[in-house]
């Protein structure tokens, strides 16, 4: 391999694309592309019991949707494949046997019952479980005999019990661990497949990975990974361990707890660009005031040394704000195209949806807010006459009734029902009555919508509703106000 930067995203196909996983993929992609490097997709499927049908498609689809295009991977191949761990079984066994020859690993024939007993003892003593090296000194004859008899075995890493192991992480700095704390972790399981802990080290080396990006929960395993690199005489890659993403101060974001996955956020009407932009800022500080970044700007600005150690809190309000910024930056045509499925779901009347898009474009932060903004277009909602009283607009029951009674015949006489003509009629009435705009416009808006807050005002709503429906609703408003007399 050359000195080219090479990063990898190595998910397990176990279901949804969690926000934390997507951030790992994004950071790995940005590190590679910042230096014109390669971004590799590797599928880590050695834990066969956790695999979920269709999860592989979720991984491919997410990378495709987000534009985090990999340069090598199972679907497109590359020079260091296969890129699926279950297809690399023989490679891991070969390297595990090399460790045995070097005296850095050993066969373990301990039964499940014995290991369960050791675990129970550790729990009773409130100590972390560590294998007791029971099989470390078996002779070659004993090992050969047990293998010949078909006794199940695993291959374990042989860690020292004295001294310490140190490693450097770009975010957390230099970390040193007493070797007495290192468990002789399993490298090859009894089914012949490697553990994640072994496979990721072998694959990262053979695939020429220069920067390993992963969650900070792997910090505690890194000394054992380093001992594997040293045992093989391999260079240790640059470690970039990212802080956890928290739901709040005390709870990690977790799909198991019903927290949003990438698919959930997309289904709620968040734009992929906004999601990526927001996730990039969960733990990374670009410096300065700028918060909205295109992918090209992220690639240029991203420096992994500016990732914080402190956990990042997933702030839905901040994500909504950012999504609103992205929605407002869309062209009207693009927004209309994205809003159409929501109109089809929410509207029961045949209305000019392009005009509705003109109203909503700057008024929604998330696309799934659209239906709740449209309810009054289908049917006039039941509302209290008290809505006609508005202190700021200086409206009362009396002047509201007068405004509606005065505007009704003028709108009835209107032959060409357009926004401009409706506006002209209403503004002429304001002059004629010598009142503030709100005295005429607030009652009309209340009558046609039945709501305190609407996208657009009286003219826009009347234009979209059409003449017949608008007049009908104004008459209902007049009746409501007359009933109070």
Swiss-Prot record:
Gene3D superfamilies for the chain: 1.10.10.350, HUPs (3.40.50.620)
Q: Which GO terms describe its cellular component?
A: cytosol
Instruction: List, separated by semicolons, the cofactors it needs.
Output: Zn(2+)
Cofactor binding, per record: Binds 1 zinc ion per subunit.
* Keyword check for GTP-binding: no
Catalyzed reaction equations: tRNA(Glu) + L-glutamate + ATP = L-glutamyl-tRNA(Glu) + AMP + diphosphate
GO process terms (BP):
glutaminyl-tRNA aminoacylation; glutamyl-tRNA aminoacylation
What HAMAP family does the database record attribute to this sequence? Glu_tRNA_synth_type1
Which NCBIfam families does the record associate with it? gltX_bact
Q: How does this protein assemble?
A: Monomer.
| Name this polypeptide is given | Glutamate--tRNA ligase
């Amino acid at each position: 391999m050359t000195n080219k930067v090479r990063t990898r995203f190595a998910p397990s196909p176990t279901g949804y694309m969690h926000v934390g996983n997507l951030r790992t993929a994004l950071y790995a992609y940005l590190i590679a592309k910042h230096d014109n490097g390669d971004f590799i997709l590797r599928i880590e499927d050695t834990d066969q019991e956790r695999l979920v049908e269709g999860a592989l498609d979720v991984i491919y689809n997410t990378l495709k949707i987000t534009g985090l295009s990999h340069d090598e991977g199972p679907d497109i191949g590359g020079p260091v494949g296969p890129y699926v761990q279950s297809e690399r079984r023989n490679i891991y066994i070969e390297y595990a046997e090399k460790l045995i020859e070097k005296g850095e690993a050993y066969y373990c024939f301990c039964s499940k019952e014995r290991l369960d007993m050791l675990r129970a003892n550790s729990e009773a003593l409130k100590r972390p479980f560590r294998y007791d090296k029971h099989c470390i000194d078996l002779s070659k004859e004993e090992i050969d005999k047990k293998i010949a008899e078909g006794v199940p075995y695993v291959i374990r890493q042989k860690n020292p019990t004295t001294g310490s192991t140190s490693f450097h992480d770009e975010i957390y700095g230099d970390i040193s661990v007493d070797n007495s704390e290192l468990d002789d972790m399993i490298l090859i399981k009894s089914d012949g497949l490697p553990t994640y802990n072994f496979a990721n080290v072998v694959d990262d080396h053979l695939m020429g990975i220069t920067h390993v990006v992963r969650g900070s929960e792997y910090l505690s395993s890194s000394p054992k990974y380093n001992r594997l690199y040293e045992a093989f005489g391999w260079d240790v890659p640059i470690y970039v361990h990212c802080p956890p993403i928290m739901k709040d101060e005390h709870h990690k974001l977790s799909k198991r707890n019903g927290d949003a996955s990438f698919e959930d956020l997309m289904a709620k009407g968040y734009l992929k660009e906004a999601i990526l932009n927001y996730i990039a800022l969960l733990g990374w500080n670009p410096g300065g005031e700028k918060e909205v970044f295109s992918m090209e700007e992220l690639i240029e600005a991203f420096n992994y040394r500016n990732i914080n150690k402190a956990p990042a809190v997933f702030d839905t309000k901040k994500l909504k704000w950012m999504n609103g910024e992205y929605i407002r930056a869309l062209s009207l045509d693009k927004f209309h195209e994205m809003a159409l499925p929501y109109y089809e779901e929410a509207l029961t009347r045949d209305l000019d949806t392009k005009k509705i898009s003109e109203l909503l474009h700057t008024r929604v932060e998330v696309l799934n807010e659209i239906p709740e903004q449209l309810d009054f277009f289908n049917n006039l909602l039941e509302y209290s006459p008290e809505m006609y009283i508005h202190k700021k607009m200086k409206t009362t029951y009396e002047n509201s009734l007068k405004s509606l009674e005065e505007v009704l015949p003028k709108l009835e006489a209107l032959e060409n029902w357009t926004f401009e003509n409706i506006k002209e009629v209403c503004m002429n009435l304001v002059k004629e009555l010598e009142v503030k705009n709100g005295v005429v416009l607030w009652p009309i808006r209340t009558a046609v919508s039945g709501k305190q807050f609407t996208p657009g005002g009286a003219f826009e709503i009347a234009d979209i509703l059409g003449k017949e429906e608008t007049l009908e609703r104004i008459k209902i408003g007049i009746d409501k106000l007359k009933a109070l007399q």
